[in-house]
Amino acid sequence: TRKIIELRHLIDAFFFMKIIQLHDYFKDSTGVVTDSRKLIQDCLFIALRGENFDGNQFAEFAIEKGAKYALVDRPEIARKNERLILVEDTLQSLQELAKYHRKKIKAKIIGLTGSNGKTTTKELINSVLSKKFNTKTTLGNFNNHIGVPLTLLEFDEDTEIGIVEMGANHQKEIDFLCQLAQPELGLITNFGQAHLQGFGGIEGVITGKSEI
């Protein structure tokens, strides 16, 4: 049992070291980009995968067009350039990077969810708080398992208050997003009929949104 525990600690330490190293790459870049059509000079391109696309295919292109580093999860791609950084899973790495970055910044986070009205409420809160504080908010409706990490990575040491919109269509999703954002204050706009199938009914909606 002791050997198993020691092995687990070694694995955790190795993973933590990789996240620290990845955060160094992030700090050495001009920001994170996941769309090769929207590259900015010296950015960190993260090659995400989807049902109908594989960002790994655009990693070399991203480097050629000005990305400083590109995060990939296909070994055969990573071998082609020393600035192509291999990880086990690019989405998980994005999320863990955001979680680590959140711990490094001093901003107070407001988490905002609800069946509807989130974006409008977010903008209203920001319009008030920005008069006194340095605030940053979710861009548009980037409020899911990809959008929330990208939002957190936009916050820097000068950010005093961050307003993070969180969307969900099934239970445990808000809980996961809160693990990333670690909000000091949670707000729920309302409980409605949206995503009833995913939540299993209105009671599921209430339970899911209340995870904040």
Regions found by a protein language model. Name each.
Residues 92-212:
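Phosphate-binding loop of NTP-binding sites
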